[in-house]
Amino acid sequence: MTQLPDDTVTRPRRRIVRGAGLELAVYERGIPDADTLVLVHGITDTHRVWDEVARMLADGFRVVTYDVRGHGRSAAPGRTDGYRLTRLADDLYAVIDAVSPDRPVHLAGHGWGAIQVWEAIYDGRANTRIASATALGAPSLDHLGMSLRQPRFPHTRWWKLPGLGWLVLGRRLLRWPRLRARPIPLTRTWPADLAAGGRIVAANLVHHLRNPRERRTAVPVQLIVDRADAAAVPAVDAHVRRGVDRLWCYRLPADHWLPITEPLLVVEAIANFIDDLRADNSPIEYSSR
């Protein structure tokens, strides 16, 4: 990608897609007949976190972003259990079916968006609907839960923490400097986005860490690990490898807000990964220099 994409290609076109019982705000840009790439944002963000990445990818892909339920212009469920990962995955498949009903799509997710992508690729529908997946900085909660149960954590017992313990742990995590240094402007929907993010965590984190599942996918997966990311958990590596038939691992010297702070690195990683799949189906492991 040596040229900047044309503005008519990069300007997003908004549409409404019916998700799992509610309406989702979906944004498309890029070349209509190109391979479709769906980008999934994390908690307390909106589709705007992908703006720069989507703009640069639009000259080679049909790029789709959307506001996860409860965020941005998408509707919110009335109950916390409406934020279960199974519902978020159903939303993602609704978007996929709406924008690319006849061809599989490529996925990429950041933070809790990556966790949603993991949930989607472990679903049976992935065999025909998902061509590849890129997870930025996050394993699945099942990977994390399995790793915390290993003998190397004999005294941790994270999955047995009482409700108050999880609250204290969550507050400590939110005080970590790298997680607090959020380099994106606040939107008018930010209070609602924050509340929705909290409900996603409440609906899923404890449940999946206490009840992790051994799962496997044939979808080619690229896991991008941010070397300087305080939220990255290297101990899950072995569990990721056991759950993925074809895994690529890409380590970057960047931080948690990779789509904002280093969008070009993200663009190159995603585009090169898809090109590698077209040329060679054997998994590799590589790092940036």
Where do the PLM segments sit?
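Residue-level detector of flexible, active-site-proximal loop/helix-junction positions
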Residues: D33, L57, S140, A254-L258
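Flexible "cap/lid" subdomain of the alpha/beta-hydrolase fold that forms the substrate-access gate
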Residues: T10-R11, L22-L24, I43-V49, V64, ...
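N-terminal targeting or regulatory segments adjacent to alpha/beta-hydrolase or S9 domains
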Residues: M1-Q3, S288
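Conserved HGGG/HGGXW glycine-rich cap/lid loop of the alpha/beta-hydrolase fold
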Residues: E28-R73
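N-terminal cap/lid segment of alpha/beta-hydrolase-fold proteins
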Residues: Q3-E23
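Catalytic active-site module of serine/aspartate enzymes centered on a nucleophile-bearing elbow/loop
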Residues: D245-R289
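Short, flexible hinge/linker loops that cap or flank conserved catalytic cores
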Residues: R18-A20, G30-P32, R215-T217
